[in-house]
Design a protein with these regions (language model features):
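Residue-level recognition of beta-strand termini and adjacent short loop/turns
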Residues: 66-68, 105, 209, 473-475, ...
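Surface-exposed coil loops of outer-membrane beta-barrel proteins
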Residues: 31-36, 40-47, 111-205, 215-234, ...
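Outer membrane beta-barrel
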Residues: 64-182, 280-281, 286-311
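Bacterial Sec-dependent N-terminal signal peptides
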Residues: 1-24, 563
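Transmembrane beta-strand segments of Gram-negative outer membrane beta-barrel proteins
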Residues: 19-47, 53-57, 65, 69-75, ...
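Exposed, low-structure sequence patches enriched in small/polar residues
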Residues: 229-563
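Outer-membrane beta-barrel proteins
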Residues: 22-27, 60-75, 78-97, 101-102, 186, 190-194, 263-275, ...
Length: 563
């Protein structure tokens, strides 16, 4: 421990000395959270601890080294101490980030190590499919923490590998051709039955002008043969064409955009040929220049066997257990993963690509559980977006009317309706107030139905989410925060049970009925735009368990710094 501290102090001194010529810079962040919870359930419970307290402090210390104008080296170490540890116990040291990136001959950009990457929504994309409403106030703090922990940024996935990109410019016909390529390793070999698995691909984007863009995209998950005793290598290929055309008039902008392609997924020893399917997504776009109004309407058709795990991997695997009050009642039953847990527990989230169909909660999102790349969906969608010039009002809404392409366990098809809307009203910008005052409203509704003459095939499930958030600046940099989050779901579903290859082998009937309500409030003080202290109290009730409803009150203190 003493030697580690000496090394850190030495690096600080070296960094301070070198910052004059920007050879070495410090980047990173620090966070400390203290929490105290009081838990109770409707049943007499003499086993579960009523009170729980905990917390931690951590610092992510990164050194960005620029040995020359075209090279950057970043190494970041995390030091974390759980509260309750003494004399160094409970302290962990981890390497959080490590990469080298640069430019060769002012033409080719490269990055090796940790890369944050995405391509298109159907090939390689990190869909946020489970948080359907815009986070605000208290929930915004929670979501910022989980996004930081899992490196969620602009729908990218954090991977380990290498990436390159370069562009060619032309005087005529085509303005620019841009090439992107990447390769990452999903899992190592165990020298036994598990083969080395990689994920690679890229795209070529032709920009004819600012009015027309055409892209050719391809990704592949593949096992490297001869890296284990297993000869049954897996491969998942996805190829697509993406496009965007725009007609810019004096008062209006019209356009069309979309992506269409095919996928194949198979094992090398599979004599059936594996799974092969297609997807189509096309939409017409409109923008009114003066008002700022934007609208789109489109059609999507994702085949039942369409597989693209770089775009269908979920952030949360709903088969896992809670880490906060995992069990309760005298029988110590498992507490189901709640909707509000998705905000409350960053450890539920993953930043890895999963080669397989991940579990989801139909109450949370049954319409597009894997985002826009969800397989076995066909239908229409539309959207509306409006922002005033002063950005005092921001409104966005999306609607989906979809159905299954192929029935599950029956020839009857599910029909889906989904609508979500988010409104942000900034009083300070609207009334020209000096102090910031902001109200945010988020609403989501989903409806799933399947009709049949047979009662056991009938499905009806409805879910509603409502979030109200208020931020009021009382005095300079001191904010009052208030949040009301409500979630309700009622109905039934028939969830498929799949084997390791993703084939449906059975169905599980689910009866869903319950409500969640969280009321939260607190104070937040901004030392700077990137450093703040917040004290929050919240009250949660949940009635989804078929055995016993529960409630818990929780008090938090957050200290967050980014540098």
């Amino acid at each position: 421990m003493k030697n580690i501290l000496i090394v850190i102090i030495t690096l600080f001194a070296f960094g301070s000395f070198s910052q004059e010529d920007k050879k070495v810079q410090f980047v990173g962040g620090a966070r400390s959270i203290i929490s105290n919870a009081n838990f109770s359930s409707d049943q007499d419970d003499t086993v579960t601890s009523r009170k729980n307290s905990g917390g931690y402090a951590l610092i992510d210390l990164g050194f960005k080294i620029n040995p020359n104008a075209s090279t950057e080296i970043l190494g970041m170490v995390r030091i974390k101490n759980a509260f309750g540890g003494f004399w160094g116990s409970g302290v962990t040291f981890d390497v959080r980030q490590l990469h080298v990136k640069g430019v060769i001959k002012n033409a080719l950009r490269y990055q090796i190590g940790n890369i944050d990457y995405k391509l298109t929504p159907y090939t390689f994309y990190n869909h946020n499919a489970d948080l359907l409403v815009q986070s605000s106030s208290v929930l915004k703090i929670k979501e910022e923490v989980l996004n930081y922990e899992s490196f969620y940024k602009n729908n990218t996935w954090r991977q380990q590998g290498a990436a390159i990109d370069f562009a060619l410019q032309f005087p005529k016909v085509v303005d620019e051709i841009k090439v992107n390529a990447f390769i990452t390793r999903l899992n190592p070999s165990d020298l036994g039955n598990i083969l080395e698995r990689f994920y690679g691909g890229g795209n070529v984007i032709f920009t004819q002008s600012k009015y027309l863009t055409l892209g050719f995209n391809h990704v592949s998950i593949f096992d490297l043969k001869n890296t284990a005793l297993n000869e049954n290598a897996y491969r998942n290929n996805v190829s697509s064409v993406s496009y965007k055309a725009t007609l810019d008039l004096k008062k209006h902008i019209f356009g069309i955009s979309g992506e269409s392609g095919i996928s194949s997924s198979a094992l090398s020893l599979d004599t059936t040929g594996g799974l092969n399917d297609y997807f189509i997504n096309v939409q017409a776009n409109y923008q009114h220049k003066k008002s700022g109004l934007k609208a789109h309407v489109g059609y999507m058709d994702n085949g039942a066997d369409f597989r693209s795990f770089g775009a269908q991997s979920k952030r949360v695997d709903f088969n896992q257990l809670n880490h906060f009050y995992e069990r309760y009642t005298n029988d110590q039953i498992i507490r189901p993963l709640s909707n509000y847990d998705l905000y409350n527990d960053p450890t539920l989230y993953s930043n890895s690509i999963t080669t397989g169909i991940m579990a989801y909660n139909p109450a949370v999102n049954n319409v597009l559980p894997y985002g826009i790349a969800t397989f076995n969906r066909r239908g229409l969608f539309a959207g509306l977006k409006y922002t005033t010039k002063k950005e005092s009002i921001k409104f966005e809404s999306n609607y989906y009317r979809l159905g299954e392409v192929r029935g599950q366990g029956t020839t009857n098809l599910r029909n889906f309706n989904s609508v979500n809307a988010n409104l942000e009203f900034n009083f300070s910008k609207f009334f020209n107030w000096k102090k910031e005052q902001k109200l945010t409203v988020g609403y989501a509704f989903q409806d799933t139905k399947r009709t049949s003459d047979l009662s056991y095939e009938q499905i009806s499930l409805k879910s509603t989410t409502l979030n109200l958030g208020l931020e009021m600046e009382l005095v300079d940099d001191l904010y009052l925060l208030a949040n009301s989050y409500y979630f309700k779901s009622k109905g039934n579903e028939s969830m498929p049970v799949r084997n390791a290859e993703g084939e449906i082998i059975n169905y599980t009937a689910m009866n869903i009925s319950g409500e969640e309500l969280c009321l939260a409030g607190g104070l937040k003080y901004n030392f700077t735009p990137s450093i703040y202290l917040a004290a929050i109290y919240e009250s949660n009730t949940n009635s989804f368990s078929s055995v016993s409803s529960y409630r818990y009150n929780q008090f938090y203190i957050y200290y967050i710094m980014k540098f």
